Amino acid sequence: MNSLSVKTQFGWITAIEANGKIIRVKFDKNNKNSKTKSLIKFKKSLNNYFKKKKSIVFNYKIRGNKIQKKVWGELKKIPFGKTKSYGEIAKKFKISPRHVGKICAQNKIPMAIPCHRVIRSDGSLGGFTARGGIKLKKKLLKFES
C-alpha cells in the first residue's frame, strides 16, 4: 500500500492507495509519502477542492454492502455547498435516518463521499466520525458555503 499526506487549512489529510485506487482517506499525517498516479490525482483534486473549484473526484475502491453503496452513491450527488438531511436520504432507500447515519460513519473515503454534507432535519449537524469530529464537519460546511 502507498500513501500521501497533504497539509490543508483543516490539518493533514492522508490518502491510502492499493492497486491504483484510493481505499482510505484519513484526517491525519502519514510520514511515508508515495507519488503514484492515483495519489497525485488525489492531491490535485484536493487542491481544487480547497480553491473552491469543485467536489473531490478521484479513483477509489470502497467495500460495502448493497445499501451502503447506494447511500454512498447518493451522498456523492450532494453538490458542493449544499446539504441533505439524514431523513431525506433515508426516505429514498426506505431505511431509518439512524441507519443513514451509521452508513455515513462507516465511510472510509470522506471528502470524495461527502458525508459531512448530511445533517439532521432540524438543521443541526448530527455526527461526524472523522478525526476532528463535529468541529471539522462545521468547518467544512462553512468553507463550502
Identify the role of each PLM range.
Residues M1-I95, F143:
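Basic nucleic-acid-binding alpha-helical/helix-turn surface characteristic of O6-alkylguanine DNA
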Residues F58-G64, R120-S121, G127-A130:
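Generic structural "secondary-structure junction" signal
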Residues L75, C115-H116, L140:
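Structural signal for hydrophobic
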Residues C104:
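DNA major-groove recognition helix of helix-turn-helix
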Residues N107:
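The DNA-recognition helices of helix-turn-helix-type DNA-binding domains
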Residues M111-R120:
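Short Lys/Arg-enriched helix C-cap and helix-to-coil transition segments
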Residues S124-S145:
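…primarily DNA-binding HTH/wHTH and HhH modules…
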